[in-house]
Each structure stands twice: as structure tokens, then as C-alpha cells.
A protein has these predicted regions:
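Adenosine-nucleotide cofactor-binding segment
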Residues: 1-56
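A polyampholytic, Gly/Pro-enriched intrinsically disordered region
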Residues: 25-28, 95-96, 118-124
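Short, solvent-exposed polar/charged micro-motifs at secondary-structure junctions
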Residues: 36-37, 108-110, 133-134
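Short leucine-rich amphipathic alpha-helices used at interfaces
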Residues: 40-41, 69-70, 120, 126
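Flexible, charged surface loops at secondary-structure boundaries
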Residues: 40-44, 63-66, 134
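Glycine-rich phosphate-binding loop and adjacent beta-alpha segment
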Residues: 52, 56-116
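C-terminal capping/lid region of NAD(P)-dependent oxidoreductase domains
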Residues: 112-134
Length: 134
């Protein structure tokens, strides 16, 4: 990606993600509010990855994605009928993918990121405590 935008729901999360430096821009909005998401993002993006743990975020993700772009739904809270019907209702020409959660070696890669990338480790331990990344 040429630019990474993180969308978070609270000022606390905004401060954490901004401090981490992992995103080029951090915006705050309720992911369940499609109009607020679109306004916060501004210019639609090429790829949207949905990894929230609350239902009702499908339409915001679709609105945030540029025509011809891709939405990756990587959340067990996703309603795929809502996503499909929402894309049709919004006249959105986007590709929608389902993240299945498993890729060979994914656990090792995730742990390696926490161990070797200071920004990822700091963001992780700011939520879980310093001993959790050991």
C-alpha cells in the first residue's frame, strides 16, 4: 500500500495508533456508521481490511473503498448477506474477499512481528501489559 489509514473508534485508540507510527494517517469514526466512515476517510481507498469485532461495519467499509477496489472482510462479525446486498444497494463496484484466518506459517509470522518490530510490540503491550509479548 502506498498509504495506510487506520480507522479507530476512540480518542485513546487514535493516540495509541498514532504514537505507534504504523499508519500514515489515523482517523476516528464509528465503523458502524457508513457516512461517518466515508467522511473520516475522505478520498476512497484501494484496499479496505475489516478486522473489527462488532457487527454492522460492512457498509462503511464498502463506502470507504474506491470503485474497482477490494474489501477484505477479516472479522467473524461480518454479515456476508449484508455486505453483498449493501454493495448492490450502494452501487459499489468493489471486490469482496473473505479472510479465512489461516495461512501456513501465519502464527510464526505474527509472533515474529511482535518480537522484532518495536512499534507492533509497543502497540500490543499497551493493550495487554508488558509481559504478554514474552
Amino acid at each position: 500500500a502506498s498509504r495506510v489509514i487506520g480507522l479507530v473508534p476512540t480518542a485513546e485508540e487514535e493516540a495509541r495508533l498514532t504514537a505507534s507510527g504504523l499508519a500514515d494517517a489515523v482517523v476516528r469514526a464509528d465503523a458502524r456508521d457508513p457516512v461517518a466512515v466515508a467522511a473520516a476517510i475522505g478520498e476512497p481507498v484501494d484496499v479496505t481490511v475489516v478486522c473489527v469485532d462488532v457487527p454492522g461495519c460492512e457498509h462503511g467499509a464498502i463506502l470507504a473503498t474506491a470503485p474497482g477496489g477490494t474489501v477484505v472482510f477479516f472479522s467473524m462479525a461480518t454479515s456476508f448477506p449484508a455486505a453483498a446486498l449493501g454493495a448492490e444497494g450502494l452501487a459499489a463496484d468493489v471486490t469482496m474477499l473473505i479472510g479465512n484466518g489461516y495461512v501456513p506459517g501465519h502464527a510464526e509470522t505474527a509472533l515474529d512481528l511482535v518480537r522484532t518490530e518495536p512499534a507492533v510490540r509497543a502497540l500490543f503491550t499497551s493493550r495487554t501489559g508488558p509481559d504478554s509479548a514474552e
